[in-house]
Amino acid sequence: MLKPLGDRVVIEVIETEEKTASGIVLPDTAKEKPQEGRVVAVGKGRVLDSGECVAPEVEVGDRIIFSKYAGTEVKYDGKEYLILRESDILAVIG
């Protein structure tokens, strides 16, 4: 399993099927970049200048919304993931 370092978080992106108002399903080339995902791994947290470690606010299993162009896409064990900093996470859903 991927284990992120520092304040990084591993996300499994949740793809949504996009349709136009008239019900036409858009091809992948016309879709917006996804911004929703599920947290699959969390680093130990951000280290402050004082050396203190600040624990992450998100947990494994959280559904989140993140910045559109944030993170690095990686492929591991046949699946695609996104590794991003906790500061790129905008909200936890639910």
Swiss-Prot record:
Q: Keyword Transcription on this protein?
A: no
MF terms from GO for this chain are:
ATP binding; metal ion binding; protein folding chaperone; protein-folding chaperone binding; unfolded protein binding
Record carries keyword Chaperone: yes
In terms of Pfam families, this protein maps to: Cpn10 (PF00166)
Q: Which cysteines are joined by disulfide bonds?
A: none
**Swiss-Prot/TrEMBL GO biological process terms:** chaperone cofactor-dependent protein refolding
**PROSITE patterns documented for this protein:** CHAPERONINS_CPN10 (PS00681)
Q: Which SMART domains match?
A: Cpn10
User: Which GO terms of the cellular component aspect does the record hold?
Assistant: cytoplasm
Kindly state which keywords UniProt assigns to this record, in alphabetical order. Chaperone, Cytoplasm
Question: Can you tell which superkingdom this protein's organism belongs to?
Answer: Bacteria
Q: Where located? A: Cytoplasm
**Function, in words:** Together with the chaperonin GroEL, plays an essential role in assisting protein folding. The GroEL-GroES system forms a nano-cage that allows encapsulation of the non-native substrate proteins and provides a physical environment optimized to promote and accelerate protein folding. GroES binds to the apical surface of the GroEL ring, thereby capping the opening of the GroEL channel.
The annotated subunit structure for this chain is: Heptamer of 7 subunits arranged in a ring. Interacts with the chaperonin GroEL.
The entry assigns this protein to a family as follows: Belongs to the GroES chaperonin family.
Name of the protein this chain belongs to: Co-chaperonin GroES
